[in-house]
Design a protein with these regions (language model features):
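Residue-level signature of the transmembrane alpha-helical cores
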Residues: 14, 50, 78-88, 104, ...
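Helix-loop junctions at membrane interfaces in 12-TM secondary transporters
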Residues: 4-8, 91-104
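Residue-level signature of mid-helix packing/kink "hotspots" within the transmembrane helices
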Residues: 23, 51-63, 113
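Pair of pore-lining "gating" transmembrane helices in MFS-fold secondary transporters
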Residues: 3-35, 106
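Extracellular/periplasmic helix-loop-helix junction of adjacent transmembrane segments
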Residues: 30-59
Length: 132
């Protein structure tokens, strides 16, 4: 096994970005949706959809990202995840369309299943004697 412990800071940054993707937009989202959506019921629907979309897609696509990391390697899958999250962080800042923002949350959630890949990377970097 090659020594991959040098990549641990990269892994921690990937996990941090995944976690930021969940909650970073929460303080801004009510104002953003309130400016675009009309009624309170529409605002509530859009807020709920945007908050659920990220977590649901993360839950659904984590096994897929894990399988891809087994096939193509951990680092390429993690880099793909960072790219997808970068798009997700950028789109709400530039868009005035709720469906586009919702799509960015869905896309971000699809790419944010990197926690499982990060755990596999750490497992690869740890020798059997030091595993729990």
């Amino acid at each position: 096994m090659k020594n991959t412990a040098a990549g641990v800071p990269f892994i921690l940054i990937c996990v941090l970005l995944d976690i930021l993707g969940i909650g970073l937009i929460i303080p801004v989202l009510p104002q953003l949706v309130g400016d675009i959506a009309g009624s309170q019921s529409a605002q509530a629907w859009w807020l709920g959809a945007m908050l659920v979309a990220y977590g649901l897609m993360q839950f659904c696509f984590a096994p897929t990202l894990g399988a891809l990391s087994d096939r193509y390697g951990r680092r390429p899958v993690l880099l793909l995840g960072i790219f997808g999250l970068g798009i997700m962080f950028l789109v709400p800042a530039l868009s005035q369309s709720l469906p586009v923002i919702l799509f960015s949350r869905i896309l971000g959630g699809m790419f944010a299943g990197n926690i499982a890949v990060a755990q596999a990377y750490i497992s690869d970097a740890t020798d059997k004697a030091h595993r729990a």
